[in-house]
Curated annotation (Swiss-Prot):
It is a multi-pass membrane protein. It comes from Limosilactobacillus reuteri (strain DSM 20016). GO terms for cellular component: plasma membrane. The keyword RNA-binding does not apply. Belongs to the UPF0756 family. Its main location: membrane. This is UPF0756 membrane protein Lreu_0946. It is found in: Cell membrane. Keywords: Cell membrane, Membrane, Transmembrane, Transmembrane helix. It comes from the Bacteria.
Length: 151
């Protein structure tokens, strides 16, 4: 029952915040909970969902290459500007943080609750996008490790 109340609260916050992605995600999870025998599928979705999401995002990012909107000239041009180098550096940093984030989420489930709350606040109050829980977890890992803190 508690999970339904929590999901309903998330749905209300998403509706109030006009965040269609969070509304859709919450409704999908609620529908999955309603369907008999899906309890065994939920852990699979939880475990593999981030990878599936990254795959979908990667496909979307590669489409301009496939359509010819982005080519090698654009790639070389990126290395000619400071902004291009910063973008490459941030891409590397995000990949590294995500690696630690995935490990952190698996090792310390309590982090998930705080990250979900932070993500909801960021999405609803600041019109952010819920694309960063793994990165946020990686950042949490780095700060917690740096400050020698524990959950």
């Amino acid at each position: 029952m508690e999970s339904w109340l929590f999901l309903a609260l998330v749905l209300l916050i998403a509706i109030f915040g006009h965040n269609s992605s969070l509304i859709i995600a919450t409704v999908i999870v609620m529908v999955l909970k309603l369907i008999p025998y899906t309890a065994k599928w939920l852990p699979l979705i939880q475990h593999k969902g981030i990878n599936w999401g990254v795959t979908v995002i990667s496909v979307a990012i590669l489409i301009p290459i496939a359509t010819g909107q982005i080519g090698f000239n654009d790639l070389w041009a990126a290395f000619k500007t400071p902004a291009g180098w910063i973008a490459v550096g941030m891409g590397i940093a995000v990949a590294i943080l995500s690696k630690y984030g995935v490990n952190q989420l698996a090792a310390v489930p309590q982090v998930t609750v705080a990250l979900v709350l932070g993500t909801i606040i960021g999405v609803v109050a600041f019109k952010g996008i819920a694309a960063g829980p793994v990165i946020a977890s990686g950042m949490t890992y780095c700060i917690v490790t740096l400050l020698n803190l524990h959950f």
